[in-house]
Amino acid sequence: MGQLDGKVALITGAGGMKGIGRACALKLASQGADIVVSDFKREPKDLPPQEVKAKWRSIDSVSEEVEALGRRCLKIWCDLTVSDQIEDMVRRAAGHYGHIDILVNNARAIIGRDRVGVTDLREEVWDRFMRINATAMFLATKFVGRIMIEKGNGGRIVNMASDASKRGRAKMAAYNASKFAVIGLTQASALDLAPHRITVNAVCPGSVNTDRLNYWEADQAQAKGLTLEEFRAGIVADAGKSVPLGRIAEPEDVANLVAFLASDEAAFITGQAYNVNGGTLFH
């Protein structure tokens, strides 16, 4: 018996081969939950090279892995910049399983085009980061929250924030602002939903060893005459040197905390923002 037996978890941004969303899907499934995985259909140019080489098929591949664990999995393609698609995603998930017990708001905008000073930041880039990282999370919380209230069985909402939710950095205005918004949404919705026994918490990873495409990394690799894999390996090694525990996080490190916050053991925890960073930030 798993601690999430009988639960249904909806996870956004779940299609990456080395992503946090996939790690969450597999972790929650391993503990007994049935899963809904959602992601945006990307063009080949927007896929990490390792996914292309491996012929990875986004949420199709994740769904097969979940089913191999003996759990059911529903796949839903969703563009989080379109409000109607978010509402339809939630409606389909609830209609398929009859309920949603866990929401993991994991999706984020592809970083890189935002890595400029605030005076050079384009409004459309700012808008996209706010739309995907904050507005889409609000809408998913709104629609799933309504279903949880209607069913009357409580629920768990886990929002993927970042250490950038707690500390501003130069050339990160759009990302910082969108992730600071996640903390505000988490705290306010935790209070709104507490009377219904629905908890809302945030997870704040530091650097994580994922392969999600980063436009800045791609541009830097090209400028240095390196493959993206070579450049990223150097980034991972260098970043690990500044972490007290000696390495950056793996997606599974983040998924472990998500699974705890999704469980009955976390029933009295709400409105919190937990770091997963190996000791690089303490508040």
Model regions: which residues?
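Active-site helix of classical SDR
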Residues: 141, 178, 186
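Conserved mid-core segment of classical short-chain dehydrogenase/reductases
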Residues: 49-60, 87, 109-127, 146, ...
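Alpha-helical segment proximal to the catalytic Tyr-Lys
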Residues: 146, 191-192, 267
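Canonical Rossmann dinucleotide-binding motif of NAD(H)/NADP(H)-dependent dehydrogenases/reductases
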Residues: 2-38, 42
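Short, small/polar-rich loop/turn modules that mediate ligand/substrate recognition or access, typified
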Residues: 194, 199, 269-271
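Short C-terminal tail/terminal secondary-structure segment
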Residues: 115, 167, 241, 245-247, ...
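Residue(s) in the substrate-gating loop at a strand-loop-helix junction
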Residues: 162
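Catalytic Tyr-X3-Lys loop
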Residues: 119-138, 158, 182
